[in-house]
Every structure is written in structure tokens, then in C-alpha cells.
């Protein structure tokens, strides 16, 4: 039986930390869907379509990974794809507290819903999209924070 998972996020932009978690997920699951949330409430730096495009570029060499956008409840997106497992990355205890609440809420919406938590490698544990956006706003170098394939998208 093939097992698939969804790795949801805003990916504003996708980072080396995200890519690390995606690669780890491919070692556990036969298929990984990177689900790029529209997330208008977060006021993203990059448009939804641009974030989808960057995610596709970042994972293009991973054969069992696909990228899709979504703008509905994660549980509904998962059901529509026949997948009941999501991957979430954890960098710190603060991530765990937030992700645990979200995981419980999703399970309350669909009792077959499972959340698997993965940690990025130590050298990527500090990276977040928020840090990348902050560095970008100050014209800093993010080449060690994001996949090389998307750097051209981040240049003003």
C-alpha cells in the first residue's frame, strides 16, 4: 500500500528548512504533496501563484513530490485528495505548542486525520520564512537560507 502525506504551509517564501522537512518526508512516504496555502490573513510578501511557482522550482528534482495550491480548510483539502496524514515541521518548543493545537483541531474536524511532526536538521532549525522576509526587507543575503533555485525570484 502506498502512503501519501501533505506538507502544508504558506511558504512565503519556501526555505531550506522547508526543503529539509520535505526531503525527510520523502524517506517515510511514497508521495508528498506540498500544499501552498493562500493565507490572505497573513498578508504574504509573495502572491499565491508566485509561492506555488517557487515551491515547484525548489522541489523539481524530487520525483515523489508535487506542489498544489489551496485556499480552503486543510482537512477538506486532504479529504479531496484521499490523504489523511500531514507533515509539520518543528523547530522549537514554541512551534510544538502551536502545532499541537492545530493538530488537535484538525483531528476534531476529521477523526481519521493524523499529524506527523518532523524536525529539520540542526543547521536548518533556525530558518523561518519570517527571518528570510526580514533579511530581504533589509537587502541582506539569503542565499544560505533558501533553495538556490528560487534565489532569482527573491531579487528585487
UniProtKB/Swiss-Prot annotation:
Keywords assigned by UniProt, alphabetized: ATP-binding, Coenzyme A biosynthesis, Cytoplasm, Magnesium, Nucleotide-binding, Nucleotidyltransferase, Transferase
EC code: 2.7.7.3
Primary location recorded for the protein, binned into one broad class: cytoplasm
Signal peptide: none
Residues under site feature: Transition state stabilizer: 18
Keyword S-adenosyl-L-methionine belongs to the record: no
Chain positions recorded as substrate binding sites: 10, 42, 74, 88
Co-factor(s): Mg(2+)
Entry's localization field: Cytoplasm
GO BP annotations listed: coenzyme A biosynthetic process
Binding site for ATP: 10-11, 18, 89-91, 99, 124-130
Database matches in SUPFAM superfamilies: Nucleotidylyl transferase
Pathway: Cofactor biosynthesis; coenzyme A biosynthesis; CoA from (R)-pantothenate: step 4/5
Domain of life: Bacteria
Reactions it catalyzes: (R)-4'-phosphopantetheine + ATP + H(+) = 3'-dephospho-CoA + diphosphate
A Pfam match: CTP_transf_like
One MF annotation (Gene Ontology) recorded for this entry: ATP binding
A single GO cellular-component term on record: cytoplasm
NCBIfam families xref list: coaD_prev_kdtB, cyt_tran_rel
Biological role stated in the UniProt entry: Reversibly transfers an adenylyl group from ATP to 4'-phosphopantetheine, yielding dephospho-CoA (dPCoA) and pyrophosphate.
Family: Belongs to the bacterial CoaD family.
HAMAP family: PPAT_bact
Protein name: Phosphopantetheine adenylyltransferase
Source organism of the structure: Campylobacter concisus (strain 13826)
